[in-house]
């Protein structure tokens, strides 16, 4: 439920806010696409943490590049 709400917020940002701004993300996939994938793959808590870490790296002094969402690690 929380995961779906967070994904919805990112989707709203993608549809309403992002088109008004110039492209600025230094990574592939974009930070918002990364957020959706991270939330869907890892859930609300870990997906949010991964998204915050990614957003903190998205600045002019970081090289950027390809930065995929980590795969789920199997539990022992």
Curated annotation (Swiss-Prot):
Pfam families xref list: YidD (PF01809)
Coiled coil: none
Organism, scientific name: Anaeromyxobacter sp. (strain K)
Keyword Glycoprotein appears in the UniProt entry: no
InterPro entries: Membr_insert_effic_factor_YidD
Intracellular or extracellular location(s): Cell inner membrane
Protein name: Putative membrane protein insertion efficiency factor
Taxonomy, superkingdom: Bacteria
Highest classification ranks of the organism: Bacteria, Pseudomonadati, Myxococcota, Myxococcia, Myxococcales
Functional summary from the UniProt entry: Could be involved in insertion of integral membrane proteins into the membrane.
Cellular component, GO, one term: plasma membrane
Keyword terms, alphabetized: Cell inner membrane, Cell membrane, Membrane
Membrane topology of this protein: Peripheral membrane protein
Family statement drawn from the similarity comment of this UniProt entry: Belongs to the UPF0161 family.
